[in-house]
Amino acid sequence: MLKLFSAFRKNKIWDFNGGIHPPEMKTQSNGTPLRQVPLAQRFVIPLKQHIGAEGELCVSVGDKVLRGQPLTRGRGKMLPVHAPTSGTVTAIAPHSTAHPSALAELSVIIDADGEDCWIPRDGWDDYRSRSREELIERIHKFGVAGLGGAGFPTGVKLQGGGDKIETLIINAAECEPYITADDRLMQDCAAQVVEGIRILAHILQPREILIGIEDNKPQAISMLRAVLADSHDISLRVIPTKYPSGGAKQLTYILTGKQVPHGGRSSDIGVLMQNVGTAYAVKRAVIDGEPITERVVTLTGEAIARPGNVWARLGTPVRHLLNDAGFCPSADQMVIMGGPLMGFTLPWLDVPVVKITNCLLAPSANELGEPQEEQSCIRCSACADACPADLLPQQLYWFSKGQQHDKATTHNIADCIECGACAWVCPSNIPLVQYFRQEKAEIAAIRQEEKRAAEAKARFEARQARLEREKAARLERHKSAAVQPAAKDKDAIAAALARVKEKQAQATQPIVIKAGERPDNSAIIAAREARKAQARAKQAKLQQTNDAATVADPRKTAVEAAIARAKARKLEQQQANAEPEQQVDPRKAAVEAAIARAKARKLEQQQANAEPEQQVDPRKAAVEAAIARAKARKLEQQQANAEPEQQVDPRKAAVEAAIARAKARKLEQQQANAEPEEQVDPRKAAVEAAIARAKARKLEQKQANAVPEEQVDPRKAAVAAAIARVQAKKAAQQKVVNED
């Protein structure tokens, strides 16, 4: 009785939530044995037929290749691809591949020579004597990948499992409608499949090996039981037919009762799963020494005259396979790669067969039914009831449609296996899987961009750190290379620092003023007076320098001399016109006369010592002489008309006469020494003389018509005469400048 209970426990199966039961439609293709397809004339082999990066090319255009010869090198997760037949490489260019959008990927195009010659094959019949690493390396080198649809490199998967795998599951469920590739393979090649399972078990060394197969494959079940009759290490588990029981997480739960955690892998719970077709490919790679160059493909649908399962070479165009099966396309014919729930429509038939191609479905119009338009979601929750991954498809639909990537990620959209059960039961005909695929692609693109940004940030920070290190090292070198100061320099530096500290201490000391006392500002006043004295000395020195550097202007000197003479005459007139009650101090008068004579001599010396850098204009000199004579006559008339209230001082008169004679001689010398560089225009000279005579007559008439009662003030007359002379000279100078 205990053994019976143990047997029941050992063969127990579990059921997952959700799932659907669509029409199977498997009888169209599982009744005929596997057959070979004639070779196509041209093969297109994409470099990437698996999850991961493409390998490195090792052939060139024009090379001759044999069947099984590697076209790329696979390193790490990169998986190599091999030539499906012998021929010549005619091109290496992008070509549309097995993808919903038929994206162009780099491919090797081979023209077959029809001989189909193999490379030398080296099989390992004694694989049990080989190490685990050698077997994994051979499986990877021969390009074996998961043939159940994912395309994950088998060697990488086995390497990642390591020693923690307790259960090896062989997926033989093949739950999707129409597809019978694994069913037919188990019927025709059951012994080879079991041999491949034993190789995998030898590599992983699990505690148990389970084969999960649905109960709708009776012939395959009987063939496997016949092969496993004498084996006790492999258990065959027959499970109820339910879609999608062939999913990795679903089949793991059905056979073991263990659930794969969200975002995790089956290896996290000690389980590793491989497909039936993958086990067969492992057997051919290890024992037969044949790389994967072909696989079983189901050709089905009412538009195909001879449906069945064929051995299709990788790289064979889909059109070639369909034509060999009697393809009869309708007006709007649709060809689906994969099953009706998880497959995708091909945009054209030149797409090649790849490692993950398990079915080509060409349904008729009756099978497709009437096309139905997408309608709004009614929140019926039928999709949530059918979801085998326990997700909320209606919520994921809204998040995907609204570009709410964070919420979609939080609701575990990555756990969606894209089985299509939700879309199958949706009464609004919403293509939910299409939305989920697009959302996954957008999230993957965002993460890739974030990864690139993080890498760029890391590179930038590393560069900044390197620059900081180089800067610190450079400063350290400069510091170590600096010359140490001598003893006297150190003393000077110390003294300077002491002075600075003393000043700072003085500046920070508070000013205290006692009550009733006035602050002593004598030091500040003395310092200010010293600064003023220094400024005056500096200004005087600068003035002397400017006087020595600047050459005296003759015209300016003459003007200053005239002003000095006017001031002297003004003083003499003031003394002559002074009231008799106010006696003149002889000493003061003598001092003033001496000062006037000194100023006059100084001006005469400046005029005599000035270099004649500019030649005197004869016309200008003549005008000035005429103006001077007119002013002299005017002064004589004023003096003659003035009442002699006071007696004229003989000494002052003698001084004035001497000054007048000196000025007259000076003007005559200037006129005599002036070089006639330019000829005087007679007409202009006559005009100027006439103007001077007119002005003189006008002045005489004004003086004659003056009221005798109103006496002329001699001081005002002298000032007016001096101003007139200065203005006349200035006008003459301006005229000369304008003529030049």
From Swiss-Prot:
InterPro entries: 4Fe4S_Fe-S-bd, 4Fe4S_Fe_S_CS, Ion_transpt_RnfC/RsxC, Nuo51_FMN-bd, Nuo51_FMN-bd_sf, RnfC_N, Soluble_ligand-bd
Domain of life: Bacteria
Disulphides: none
GO cellular component: plasma membrane
BP term (GO), one: electron transport chain
Family of this protein: Belongs to the 4Fe4S bacterial-type ferredoxin family. RnfC subfamily.
Protein name stated in the entry: Ion-translocating oxidoreductase complex subunit C
Keyword terms, alphabetized: 4Fe-4S, Cell inner membrane, Cell membrane, Electron transport, Iron, Iron-sulfur, Membrane, Metal-binding, Repeat, Translocase, Transport
Annotated cofactor note: Binds 2 [4Fe-4S] clusters per subunit.
Domain 4Fe-4S ferredoxin-type: 369-397, 407-436
Principal location listed in the UniProt entry: membrane
Compartment annotation: Cell inner membrane
Chain residues that bind [4Fe-4S] cluster 2: 387, 416, 419, 422
Enzyme Commission number(s) of this protein: 7.-.-.-
Cofactor dependence: [4Fe-4S] cluster
HAMAP family: RsxC_RnfC
Binding sites annotated in the UniProt record for [4Fe-4S] cluster 1: 377, 380, 383, 426
Composition bias type Low complexity, residue spans: 605-615, 637-647
Subunit structure comment from the entry: The complex is composed of six subunits: RsxA, RsxB, RsxC, RsxD, RsxE and RsxG.
Molecular function per GO: 4 iron, 4 sulfur cluster binding; electron transfer activity; metal ion binding
Main function: Part of a membrane-bound complex that couples electron transfer with translocation of ions across the membrane. Required to maintain the reduced state of SoxR.
PANTHER family named among the record's database cross-references: ION-TRANSLOCATING OXIDOREDUCTASE COMPLEX SUBUNIT C
Membrane topology, as annotated: Peripheral membrane protein
Organism whose genome encodes this protein: Escherichia coli O7:K1 (strain IAI39 / ExPEC)
Gene3D superfamilies noted in UniProt: 3.30.70.20, NADH-ubiquinone oxidoreductase 51kDa subunit (3.40.50.11540)
Annotated region (Disordered), positions in chain: 602-684
This protein's encoding gene: rsxC
